[in-house]
């Protein structure tokens, strides 16, 4: 029996319980409806972008990009790809978490790793597009199976969109959807990273080139991508203080209790300073509590729950059963042929484009 998109999302949310992802309150059925209740969050990045005259500053774009990379790295670590990365599917938190970016909408997500065969899903071509054409990768638009690289390419296009206000392949007047997708794909393929990032910091061109050149099963270097965005902040004498373009005042963060570092040795200590510190040290501290983590750049905080009482629904699904059912979540849209494609088959062949 095929899952509904909402059931797929509920299944994945029950498996992804981490910072920057909405908490699922309950999932169930009520008469003719599937119902998913999750915590109330703030506005989407698309709505904030539109209300900010369709432009974000370099600082805001980089701060958002770093958090996007944090979120997608965690999702990928759980063997899941999102497949519909776009500004509408990122939202800010509320209250004391208003500076935190959340990622939403896992209805099109799937596993890229076969639990049965203990290997990466195989490469397949001739597939229809899953996701949103404007932000989809060149490979996804070309009918190729998606993997981690495609989520990252979509993030790259979002960053350019925020800085430029539009993308070169927007506004094509083609009524037929298939023809429009082909034209968008052609336009993307013919727009080099240099042309796409003309007039923008060189780090962005490097980022676009990197994600476009990743191999199908290659493990992305998320730290390297975060470092590129952090370097832009440093070169512009600013820092990740979570003061975004739409803020009227600086977020109310207890700076005395905030420290974050990452594997490339950059630390923000709450005093508007970027410091070079021990590259092996990586932790988050909020309200005196340290949170060990491999990498990243976000600040941990207690989640805000807007729903105090969760309504009861007929045939509501148990979270535990959803978590068990996650093991049966599909890994490929077509039948899996069992061919082994290991995560380690590819070396980091894209490193030669680094500057």
Describe the role of every protein-language-model region.
Residues 234-355:
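Extended, low-complexity, intrinsically disordered C-terminal regulatory tails
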Residues 64-65:
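Activation segment signature within eukaryotic-like protein kinase domains
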Residues 1-19:
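The N-lobe alphaC helix and its flanking beta3-alphaC-beta4 segment of protein kinase-like domains
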